[in-house]
A protein has these predicted regions:
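Short secondary-structure junction motifs
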Residues: 6-8, 64-68, 105-107
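Periplasmic peptidoglycan-binding/tethering modules of Gram-negative envelope proteins
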Residues: 1-63, 139-142
């Protein structure tokens, strides 16, 4: 229920499996801006990520076949060192999903995409571009 009511999380089936997008907004930032150089998830970011923990654990089992997980971090245009920032975001999300029962061996990619893939090319600096994606790959990569 919590996941369905969260307007900042979008889940969709894709050819590879299930893609979960987590978006920041002005009033709901996924990351704690007051943490200085030590990047941290905000309380909202932790709640959003924890709301999919059960789903991640379910795909972890996948009828004994398991599945792989890819994490991609994104930043809006105008962030200092967007590649480094987005890589740090992905690593932070990785650390948190391990706490939810995901096995380290399941996470096959941790990607920092910087500001190279804005949601809306017309608004590359929009807060929604400060986001991360989790791909639960249920089909092997070709």
């Amino acid at each position: 229920k919590e996941l369905r009511e969260n307007r900042n999380i979008q889940m969709e089936r894709v050819d590879e499996g299930v893609l979960i997008n987590f978006f920041s907004e002005t009033d709901r930032n996924l990351f704690d801006e007051s943490s200085g150089d030590d990047l941290a998830l905000s309380d909202y970011g932790l709640m959003a990520l924890n709301s999919v923990g059960v789903l991640l654990a379910r795909y972890n089992l996948n009828n004994g076949k398991g599945s792989s997980i890819e994490i991609t971090g994104h930043t809006p245009e105008g962030v200092d060192d967007p590649w480094s920032m987005s890589a740090k975001q992905s690593a932070l999300v990785f650390d948190e999903i391990l706490k939810s029962g995901v096995q380290e061996s399941q996470v096959v990619k941790i990607i920092g995409a910087g500001d190279s893939i804005p949601l809306d090319a017309e608004k590359p600096g929009d807060m929604k571009n400060r986001r991360f994606e989790i791909l639960i790959r249920t089909k092997p990569e070709e």
